[in-house]
């Protein structure tokens, strides 16, 4: 998966809707994952 930003408000590269942002970039979709779900990952 491709890390594009953060799911935490106020954080660097904050993404309000991870799934929608990933789709906009041409990925299948996305989800918030990693430690405490802080990162937005796009599915290749």
From Swiss-Prot:
GO terms for biological process: defense response to fungus; defense response to Gram-positive bacterium; innate immune response; killing of cells of another organism. Its main location: secreted. Disulfide bonds join 7-32, 18-40, 22-42. It comes from the Eukaryota. GO terms for cellular component: extracellular space. Coiled coil: none annotated. Hemolymph. This is Defensin-like peptide.
């Amino acid at each position: 998966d491709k890390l594009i930003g953060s799911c935490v408000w106020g954080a660097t590269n904050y993404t309000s809707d991870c799934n929608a942002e990933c789709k906009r970039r041409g990925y299948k979709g996305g989800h918030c994952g990693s430690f405490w779900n802080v990162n937005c990952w796009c599915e290749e």
